[in-house]
Amino acid sequence: MAAVWREGDDLLLRLYIQPKASRDSIVGLHGEELKVAITAPPIDGKANAHLSKYLAKLCKVAKGSVVVEKGELGRHKQVRILQPSQIPAEIAALIE
């Protein structure tokens, strides 16, 4: 299964999250997932909130348009971005 795909106007991402990183970044493929490093710690939902904010900024959408569909409490997540205005090059290159 792909790490990144389109479903209608939405963008779906299968992610592996690295919390408490030195900076926010899209690292690249990690097996069949896209590895994303974020600075927030994995405590009390801070990592999910930070991930949503980071992806919203990259795709030029509101934070509410980034939905964690699976993996709320783990490092492996599936995220839906509703009607992204922009898709970063490192993500666009992986769309199947």
Curated annotation (Swiss-Prot):
Pfam families: DUF167. Gene3D superfamilies: YggU-like. It comes from the Bacteria. One of its GO terms (cellular component) is cytoplasm. PANTHER family: UPF0235 PROTEIN C15ORF40. Belongs to the UPF0235 family. NCBIfam families: DUF167 family protein (TIGR00251), PRK05090.1 (NF003466). This is UPF0235 protein VCM66_0443.
